[in-house]
Structures are given as structure tokens and as C-alpha cells.
Amino acid sequence: MKLFPIFSDIKGRCVLVVGGGAVATRKAQALLEAGAAVSVGAPTLTPELARLAQGQTITHLQGEFDADWLKDAWLIIAATDDRTVNTRVYEAACARRQFCNVVDDPALSSFQVPSIVDRSPLIVAISSSGLAPVLARRLRERLESLFDHSLGALAELAARYRPAIRAARADLKERRRFYDWLLDGPVAAALRRAQPQQAQEALDEALARPALSQDGRVVLVGAGPGDPGLLTLKGLRALNEADVILHDRLVSAEVLALARRDAERITVGKRLGENHNATQARIHELMVEHARAGRRVVRLKGGDAFIFGRGGEELEHLRAHGVDYEVVPGITAALACAAYAGIPLTHRDYAQSVHLVTAHCRADEEALDWDGLARGQQTLAFYMGVGQLDILSARLVAHGRPGSTPFALIENGSRPSQRVVMGRLSQLAERAREQAVASPALLIVGEVAALADRLAWFGKP
């Protein structure tokens, strides 16, 4: 271990920053956040530092570096763009046995400032010992995405309740189990939703019970259309915490690869020709079964669970069986596929509204308002329509939509294998057969579909 990691309490202590530029400004602001009494030594200051000095938030030591500036300093940071000045600062600090950091110069530093992930009071520090600061910064960025911003509030709540938890759970093993529940259960979930009152109530109720509930919970997560980069941060965190993942067949392997490695993965997607109601009933059973076994369950759906994903039915089943749940929205296929094809769903010249339509209904196609769908100045996005293209185009034309209306069929939208087949509405079924378009594919009908010709950026239309 090249460096010894240490966290320092600098509240009220004098910290000297030598330099008045942008880097010095960032360092001074970070030190102020930690409660330090900051002095900045420099001939001139950035507007932000000048404002802080004018408001007496910092002390400005004006002029060229003077070793006398160090006499009251507890820590020193040299942040000038002149290595000669930085060397003088470092040597003066060493002569007085004071810790000094020269920004981006490990050879002239007796301590280094790490990259941090701040979820105060929880702080994670990352250091490459000054050898690879870009790598440390990249790791910090990844950790930022994994650590929910509610962790600080959770740590503060746990600290506030520590005496009560110790009193209610005298046995060490029971206390550890309680803390595991606190970190993984409804208290943490409420804080993630920015509901501190509900979190406190859940904690009070748990402390009043002689034993913890063994029930788990279900998180309904929208995985997006395929590109793993479109998974939300909340969705990623849920996958990293899951014990069991019940996923549809359309969820990409790349998204599943982001999940916790030891999580049990169960494919529950429906196949063409299956009894979908029976399959859905089995999904309901699995969610309840695993949650009641105390497991954290992620129900992972392609796109967004509430856009033609039967997410509402699944929540109704969970509510009826008393299972706790949470919903993490996803990017639905219409939004993502259109964007990846270069198609703006609305455009002031062509479309003032968007209709999301499923071509796979409980009843037949007569359930749709074809007169309304055939009107102009709107965009239609049809889900699950590959097997209904003849009917869709014929109905739209019969109800007044011109056969010359542009369409775009987007197959495997947002994935490396994405294809976009374009044409006129009267040619829809024929073009799809010629190009052997297969599911999953999204159909967009409207003047905006033609824009893919000149706005495409991901692959080629």
C-alpha cells in the first residue's frame, strides 16, 4: 500500500490554498463544504473567490507567495500553474513539518486528495496514488451510478436509531439481521423515494415487533428496448440488489449481464402460440412465491412495464396478496426506437400529437378508434404489429389516412442489429415481406417517419 488512507476532521481548522485560478476555486469550495477556515493566497482571484472573500467566507492573502502564510495553516494546497511557485510552497511546508498537496504533482505532495463519492455522512474515497487520476475519476463515475443518493439519509437514520436498535435487539446476531433488513427493506425503499416520514414509521413499527417480517419485495423494472445504456440508474441498482430476476424474452443479454452475478435468472417471456393468460398467471405465482420466501425480486420487462407490458395486472396481483412493491420506469420502445432511427415523434411542421397503439388486443382490431387514428398531423406508434401489417394499413387507408403517408418499421431498435425499413403506407405489408422484418419491431406511421432518411445517426435507414 503506497499511501495510507485517512479521513481528516478540518472543521474550523485553517487550510491554506495557494493560487487564485479555477483549480484553486474548486479546492477552496470543497474545503468550505467540509467546514474548514480557508485562506487563499494569490495576487488575483477568480470572480467566485473574490465574491467569497468579499463576503468574508474566505480570507484573501494578496500578493506573491510568502512562507509566512504557512504559520497558522493546518493543511496546505498548492494550486498555481507555476511549478516553481508550487515547489517553493512544498519545500516551505516540509521545513515546518506541515502536510502539503500540490495539485496533480505527486512528487511534490506529502498527501493526496482522492476522488470521492459523497453521500454524507457516507464518503467513499478512491486514489490511484497519483499514478492514474483519470482511472480514479472513471471509477468514481461508476460508483456514483451505483450508490443511490438516499444512502446519506439512511446512514443518518441508522445512527439516530442506534440506541433504540441496541435496546430492542440485544442479541448480536439478531441486531445484525435487523441492520440487514434496514439496509435492504422498506425503510431504505422509502428513503429512495424521498419519503423520510414513511421510512421512520416503518422503522418504528419494526422495532415494536418481537421479530422481523421475513417477506421480501418486488421491484418492477423497465429495461428499455435493448441498449444497456438506456437502463436507468434506479433500474441498475435494483438489478445489483436482486436475489431473483424474472425477465421477459425481449430483455437483452447485455442488460441481464449488468445484474448481480449470483442472482437467480428465470425467463418468463411469452412465446407465440402459447396460452398467454396461463403464462401470466405463472408469473404472478413466481413473484409472490419468491417474495414470501424473503427474496428481493426484480420483475424485468422490456421497454416500460406500464406501456403494453401488463405491469398494472402484476401490481394488482401483488397488492391483493400483500406483497410490497416498487416501480422503476423504463424508456418505452416508441421513444427509444424513434430516437435511434432519427425520427422525432413530434415536429411543429408535421405532428402535434403521438398515439401509442398496441396491435395485439384482447378483442379484435375493431376495438381501435380507426377514424381517430386516420387523422393527419399526428404520429402513430404501433407495438406488436408485425403480424398485423396487412390489417393495419388497410384499416388506416379505409378510414381516410392517405396511402402515401410515410412509415418506418424499426426492427431490433437501439440494438447493434437495428434495421429501419421505410416506405409508403400502401406498401407497408409488401415492404415488410420483402425485407423479412421480424419481431421485435415497432411501426411508426406519419410524416415524421420520412425524416429518418436525413436524420438517421445509428446505422442506416
Curated annotation (Swiss-Prot):
Spans annotated as Precorrin-2 dehydrogenase /sirohydrochlorin ferrochelatase: 1-203
InterPro entries: 4pyrrol_Mease, 4pyrrol_Methylase_sf, 4pyrrole_Mease_sub1, 4pyrrole_Mease_sub2, CobA/CysG_C, NAD(P)-bd_dom_sf, Siro_Cobalamin_biosynth, Sirohaem_synt_dimer_dom_sf
One family name in Pfam for this protein: NAD_binding_7
UniProt keyword Oxidoreductase present: yes
Keywords for this protein: Cobalamin biosynthesis, Lyase, Methyltransferase, Multifunctional enzyme, NAD, Oxidoreductase, Phosphoprotein, Porphyrin biosynthesis, S-adenosyl-L-methionine, Transferase
Annotated binding of NAD(+), by residue: A22, V23, P43, T44
Segments of this protein annotated with the region Uroporphyrinogen-III C-methyltransferase: 216-461
Sites where the protein binds S-adenosyl-L-methionine: P225, G302, G303, D304, I307, T332, A333, M384, G413
Molecular-function GO terms, alphabetical: NAD binding; precorrin-2 dehydrogenase activity; sirohydrochlorin ferrochelatase activity; uroporphyrin-III C-methyltransferase activity
Active site: D248, K270
Family annotation (CDD domains): SUMT
GO BP field: cobalamin biosynthetic process; methylation; siroheme biosynthetic process
Catalysed conversion reaction: uroporphyrinogen III + 2 S-adenosyl-L-methionine = precorrin-2 + 2 S-adenosyl-L-homocysteine + H(+); precorrin-2 + NAD(+) = sirohydrochlorin + NADH + 2 H(+); siroheme + 2 H(+) = sirohydrochlorin + Fe(2+)
Disulphide bond pairs: none
Modified-residue entries (Phosphoserine), positions: S128
Function: Then it catalyzes the NAD-dependent ring dehydrogenation of precorrin-2 to yield sirohydrochlorin. Finally, it catalyzes the ferrochelation of sirohydrochlorin to yield siroheme.
Family matches, as NCBIfam families: cobA_cysG_Cterm, cysG_Nterm, PRK06136.1, PRK10637.1
Family designation: In the N-terminal section; belongs to the precorrin-2 dehydrogenase / sirohydrochlorin ferrochelatase family.
Protein name per Swiss-Prot or TrEMBL: Siroheme synthase
Organism: Bordetella avium (strain 197N)
